[in-house]
Amino acid sequence: MKRYLFIIVGLLFLVGCSTKEENEKYAYLEYKNDLESQDVYDEEDSLDFDTYFNIIRNKDDNEKVDYSIVIDKPEINMYNVKALLVHDYMNEDAFPSVGIFDDPVTLRKDSADKIKLNGTINTTADTGNINFKLYLEYTDDSGEENKIYYEVKRG
């Protein structure tokens, strides 16, 4: 009898873990699809934070292009921040994110808090025509949920 009880508890544990992972994967895909289908983006001067985008060919491996975006200097407190950075280059890998597969973060006004999303594109081709888009979701001091769709301007 103890053996069956042990097996049942083990199965319930496995089902619980896979359900959480499935929910995270579903949320990630929902954010990604929503961002990729977006036609209207927030203007840079309307953002309540600064962004710095960087893209550079990897020094150690010429077939890789490293890219990153830093989100910092918020003008307001930003709680439960979730962010996803995508691009339109063919890619099988997951895009960099925060707050979707891990715990959401907080950016506080007048602090050194920042978010950095890093990714890599495996290519030797020119990357000058790749478009990058950022989705950012957060709650402000009044409890209002904000969603930002931002197209990264390059050059």
Give each language-model segment a name.
Residues 1-4:
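Positively charged n-region of N-terminal signal peptides that target proteins for export
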Residues 6-9:
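Sec-dependent N-terminal signal peptides
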Residues 13-16:
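C-terminal motif of bacterial Sec signal peptides marking the signal peptidase cleavage site
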Residues 18-95, 100-101, 111-112:
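N-terminal export/targeting and maturation segments
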Residues 51, 65-67, 81, 117, ...:
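Hydrophobic residues positioned within well-ordered beta-strands of beta-sheet architectures
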Residues 74-77, 140-144:
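Short, cysteine-centered beta-strand-loop-beta hairpins and adjacent loop/turn segments enriched
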Residues 94-142:
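Short, solvent-exposed, Trp/other aromatic-anchored flexible loops in extracytoplasmic proteins
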Residues 143-155:
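Short beta-strand elements
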